[in-house]
C-alpha cells in the first residue's frame, strides 16, 4: 500500500502521521473492520488478516486492540478540531466563518465517512483514560463552533436563544453525515457541505453571504 491508503467504498485517507508502513497498514485495516463489524465484534486476527499480516505482527506495533482504536480516535479528532479551528480563526463575518466551518466539517465526514464512523461512534469502547482524552477534544470542537455562534449573536447577525443547544444541533447534524453518506448517492461531499452550510445559516437566523474576499484584493 502507498501512503494514501484506501479504505471502504473508495475512500482515501492519508494517515501520513502513522509510521512505519506496517503500523499504517494495520491501522487502515482496523478502521475498515471497526466500521464494518463494530469494535467489539472485531478481533485482532480480523485486523491482521485484512492487513495481510500475522496476528503476532500486530502486537509489534500495537499492544492491544484498544490502542488501535485510541490512535484512530485521536488522529480523527485532531483533524476535525483543526478543520473547525481554521474556519473559526479565518477572515469574514460570523456567518461566513460558520458556513465555512460547517461546510468543511461536513465534507470531512462525507469524504472520510469510514474513518468518521469509527471516530464518532466507538467512543464508549475506549477505557476511562483514553475516553477522557477524546472527550476533552470534543469539548474543544464544541467550543470552536459555539464561539462563532456567540460572536454572531453578540453582533446581532444571528438570532439564537439557546447557544448551547444550537451548537449541539449543528455538530450533530454534521456528524450524522458519516452515518448515511453514500459515494454512489446523488450528492458529492462538496454539495452536501454547501447544503448543510445553508441549512445551518437558516437555523441561526442569518442570511446566506458570499465568501470573504481573498487577502490582498485591492477593491
Residue ranges and their predicted role:
Residues 2, 22-25, 29, 33-67, ...:
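Helix-turn-helix
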Residues 27, 81, 99, 103, ...:
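An amphipathic alpha-helix signature
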Residues 1-21, 32, 208-219:
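N-terminal intrinsically disordered/low-complexity leader segments
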Amino acid at each position: 500500500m502507498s501512503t494514501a491508503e484506501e479504505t471502504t467504498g473508495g475512500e482515501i485517507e492519508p494517515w501520513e502521521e502513522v509510521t512505519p508502513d506496517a503500523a499504517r497498514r494495520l491501522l487502515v485495516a482496523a478502521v475498515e473492520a471497526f466500521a464494518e463489524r463494530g469494535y467489539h465484534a472485531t478481533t485482532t486476527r480480523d485486523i491482521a488478516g485484512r492487513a495481510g499480516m500475522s496476528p503476532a505482527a500486530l502486537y509489534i506495533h500495537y499492544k492491544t486492540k484498544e490502542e488501535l482504536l485510541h490512535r484512530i480516535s485521536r488522529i480523527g479528532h485532531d483533524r476535525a478540531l483543526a478543520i473547525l479551528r481554521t474556519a473559526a480563526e479565518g477572515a469574514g463575518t460570523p456567518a461566513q466563518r460558520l458556513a465555512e466551518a460547517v461546510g468543511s466539517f461536513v465534507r470531512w465526514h462525507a469524504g472520510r465517512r469510514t474513518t468518521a464512523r469509527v471516530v464518532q461512534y466507538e467512543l464508549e469502547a475506549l477505557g476511562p483514560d483514553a475516553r477522557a482524552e477524546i472527550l476533552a477534544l470534543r469539548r474543544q470542537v464544541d467550543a470552536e463552533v459555539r464561539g462563532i455562534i456567540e460572536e454572531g449573536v453578540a453582533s446581532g447577525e444571528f438570532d439564537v436563544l439557546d447557544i448551547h443547544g444550537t451548537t449541539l444541533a449543528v455538530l450533530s447534524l454534521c456528524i450524522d453525515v458519516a452515518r448515511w453518506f453514500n459515494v454512489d448517492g446523488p450528492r458529492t461531499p462538496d454539495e452536501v457541505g454547501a447544503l448543510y452550510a445553508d441549512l445551518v445559516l437558516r437555523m441561526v437566523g442569518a442570511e446566506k453571504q458570499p465568501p470573504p474576499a481573498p487577502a490582498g484584493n485591492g477593491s
